[in-house]
Amino acid sequence: MANISLVALLLVTCLYVTYGKINGSHDLKVGKRGFNDVLLFQKTVSKSNWKPWGTVSEDVSFPVKKEYGLKIVITEIDAFDLDKDDKGGYAYITEGGVNYNNVTIHFKSQKGLGFNFEVTIYGHYY
């Protein structure tokens, strides 16, 4: 039984490593939108890097400014890496997120490279 589990684990690991390298994107997709959700925010976030060993980063927040009386719930957050050749950056949620009314996403490049992401946030008003 342990041998079967080990073989299954190795197979899954090999498939993950193989297809991860073929795809080469660093997409972030959190949550799932429902039938009554609307597009709340959309933005292209890109930054180039002129330092050969340095990295660049940027934070994107929604809502952009604090709007009092705005009652929303975020249901899906997508940050799609537009550089599909494994040379793009990485996206992390650092504050808020799904089931919150706000989110902050931190983007960071790989060393010596920039990044290019398309960010979309879906949710609904209540």
Language model features with spans:
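Eukaryotic short linear interaction motifs
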Residues: D86-K87, L113-F115
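Cleavable N-terminal signal peptides of Sec/SRP-targeted secreted and luminal proteins
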Residues: N3-G20
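Extracellular attachment/recognition segments
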Residues: E58-K108
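Structural signal for hydrophobic/aromatic residues that build the beta-strand cores
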Residues: L10, I77, I105, V119-I121
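Short, structured beta-strand segments at or near domain termini in extracellular proteins/domains
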Residues: G114-Y125
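Extracellular receptor-binding modules and their adjoining Ser/Thr/Gly/Asp/Asn-rich linkers
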Residues: K21-V56
